[in-house]
Amino acid sequence: MQLSASRHIIHSLAPAFALLLLGSLAAAQSPKKSDYLGNIALCNGSDRTSLSARIDGCTALIASGQGTTTALAIAYNNRGNAYTAKGDLDRAIPDFDQSIKLDPADAKPFNNRGAAYLRKGEYDLALKAFDQAIKLNPNYGRAFVNRAGVYLKKNEYDRAARGYDEAIRLEPNLEAAWSGRCWTRAILGALQAALEDCNKVLQSSQNDAATYDSRGLIHLKTGQADAAINDFSSALRVDPKLASALYGRGLARLRNGDKAGGDIDISAAKAIQAGIDDDFMRYGVRVSN
């Protein structure tokens, strides 16, 4: 429900290995070949590579002066992704800018720059970046998901829904698109269709806080308070500070007659996200419902 760094924003990591090797025959002949290859591996990263190590690897590659222009663009893009993952958006965005300057035909850094702007709350700049990514690659499902996320933040729910539809058409296995469409359909009142989208995601992703949160909203809007509490609680087990799940659970508890528990949840949600009661009013849910 709540768009955050962990929800609906999809970054693109470009594989630099082959490009960097092909771009620098001299590096392959250098006594420091092992360092160079090691930095490629670090910059490409994996789930087990720390963000700091990825940044160090990309920085070393950039400073080496080796590789093609395209490879250098990839290194900047990958370092920007690592900075974004660390929450250092003011460093990430200049890296994406530099990647775009070096390789303006690559859609990935445009997508990633948009993701950073989205996290900063600069929605118009994010939208511009995603538009450019899609212009360069009209089949870029991840960029459609991210652009839909901007439309959600701008309360343009119909446009968001169409974006998720297109992302699913392009990449049917993209869970973020199904989860995002579930939430958007729940807001728009297409509750059965929303439920089907959420259930599809939760069949394969048991730890998806956002989708549990979205399904909780569906149950709340259909008057199933117990089911809503269960789903909001599942979301909070994964993400204890998810304000929308706290607020939704609070409403469900109030409807079940648990005033003390409901008030505690709602107060906690408001402490995390001011104005969340206004958000829920836009979603068609009020405390008095």
Regions of interest found by a model, annotated:
Residues A26-Q66, T70-A73, R282, N289:
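N-terminal leader/linker segments that initiate helical-solenoid repeat arrays
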Residues T69, A107-K108, G141-R142, E175-A176, ...:
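Boundary/linker segments of alpha-helical solenoid repeat arrays
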Residues P31-N39, L254-N289:
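Terminal, low-structured helical/coil segments at or just beyond the last alpha-helical repeat
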Residues H11-S24:
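Bacterial N-terminal signal peptides
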Residues N44, I74-T84, D97, K108-R119, ...:
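Conserved alpha-helical positions within TPR/SEL1-like repeat arrays
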